[in-house]
Amino acid sequence: MQTQRLRIAIQKKGRLSKECQDLLKRCGVKFNMMGERLVVHSENMPIDLLLVRDDDIPGLIMDGVVDLGVIGENELEEVGLERAARNEPSDYKKLRRLDFGDCRLSIAIDKDATYNGPQDLQGKRIATTYPQLVKRYMDKQGVTFSTCMLNGSVEVAPRAGLADAICDLVSTGATLEANGLKEAAVILRSKAVLIQCTAELSAEKQALIDRLLTRMQGVIQAKESKYIMLHAPTDRLEQIKMLLPGAEDPTVLPLSQNNNRVAVHLVSTENLFWETMEQLKELGASSILVLPIEKMME
């Protein structure tokens, strides 16, 4: 089914849903998420959002049902391996990593057990929701094992006698600790990514995707940057500039009725820590302001 409206699949509920919606809104895409609708139409752009389960998104992209999707790399790679094993289409274009959805897929074992490496898992039973990723990792390590497939509450498997170890997503490790487990090995580090189907799109759709990518770059870069303003003595200007990690050279402006000091403005692409601000003050800087940036375009 061909449509001139850009179709974007996003997670209906879960850890990526809200941040994905926030990103699209900051990119200027207006939509109303009220109700339990599965398809939401943008109010100001030819864009439709499809709200689906996260594990459905890769297949929708790979089958060409939707144009774009936002998905965690862990789910994307798991589904891709699964489809490839069934000789189903598994191609996609990865447009960019996003600035949310950070997690890692890790093997965890009993907190009192000793772990010397993957060979310790030889012949063991591993509970996981990601059997394909675990198999890929174990095959590379030359380790044979058996899988206990679970779709939830993976961390209780060892205590219930279902498995010797688990492989699951970890953010802080608190859930592992609460269940008497410890992280033994990271097999994948994951973030949310924006992906595109491999089908040839109309010029209008591709132009809209390019616009969205430019806006996403601006939103993400703005989130990671700060606008810094300060007054600096002219005789220490070069020393002060060396302390400021800028995206470009700073703007230096004269101050009215003061020839010995200037105003310095710049966009910093790195965090300005308290220690740096204290160093700036020691060099004679004053009126130091660090401000958030809402949008950027280079």
Curated annotation (Swiss-Prot):
This is ATP phosphoribosyltransferase. GO terms for molecular function: ATP binding; ATP phosphoribosyltransferase activity; magnesium ion binding. The keyword Cell membrane does not apply. Feedback inhibited by histidine. It comes from the Bacteria. Belongs to the ATP phosphoribosyltransferase family. Long subfamily. The keyword Repressor does not apply. InterPro entries: ATP-PRT_HisG_long (IPR020621), ATP_PRibTrfase_cat (IPR013820), ATP_PRibTrfase_CS (IPR018198), ATP_PRibTrfase_HisG (IPR001348), HisG_C (IPR013115), N-reg_PII-like_a/b (IPR011322), N-reg_PII/ATP_PRibTrfase_C (IPR015867). Its EC number is 2.4.2.17.
